[in-house]
Amino acid sequence: MSTASVFMDRVRLEDGYHEDDLPFIQHSLTQLFTQLERFDPSMVHIGLRVKDRGRPGMHTSVEVCVSGLPTVIGVSHLADTRAALEDAEAKVVSQLREAADRHHDRHHDRRPRQPRH
């Protein structure tokens, strides 16, 4: 099973998205899926929302929850549905990298304590 299909199973289509959107969603979220490869898929939840789809003021969001990390949300106000999803995805990927790096630094770069004499 490909990385994309594993993580597509973790996607919740919320307000404004439909099953018909799945092919373009899978293609649009490839950077996110690549970034998520370091995590167990069962620890990942992805929510997609679009408000006022196809109208001025459209609001697209991608929300990613990875167990043990803070929830990250990317938002776009671009008018094109595909471009907005990719814009929101790029924002989430950037935040996810930062959160994962901070988490890694906190848990793996601790200096051993010096014994007391």
Stretch-by-stretch model annotation:
Residues M1-H117:
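N-terminal, polar/charged subdomain of small-to-medium soluble alpha/beta proteins
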